[in-house]
Amino acid sequence: MSTITLERPPLAGCILRVARPTDQMEAVVDFYRDGLGFPELTRFTDHDGFDGVILGFPGAPYHLEFTSARGHLAGRAPTQDNLLVVYMPDARAWSRMIGVMARRGHRPVPSFNPYWDREGVTFEDPDGYRVVLHQGLWPV
């Protein structure tokens, strides 16, 4: 039996920031900004010991933040299954994006989970985190 709730959940309509550290700020920014096309929204230096770059589309309810802290080693992704998944319903736009990534020197890698290879292409950023460009709509 399901329950119908008329009240809006507290997180509905909120903005999501995915934040993580990096030891390779400019290489990571190049991957996401110049490769994947996320515009640079802002950059900060020595904010309580942190430097960072925030990427995203103006007005979008999500953005990416990359930070570095003096004296802190961020290291690489803990597994090959740390993913951002981008669902791209337009097949031509998806093909163009794959071409842009190739021209920027980013080569596809086999996905740890073979599900993502069936309708998508996976790229690994300089820190070992992965982005899946999935060709299709999100089914939910």
Give the positions of each predicted feature.
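Short beta-strand/turn micro-motifs at beta-sheet edges
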Residues: 4-7, 70-74
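Short beta->alpha connector loops
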Residues: 46-47, 69-70, 90-91, 114-116
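Acetyl-CoA-dependent GNAT
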Residues: 67-72, 136-138
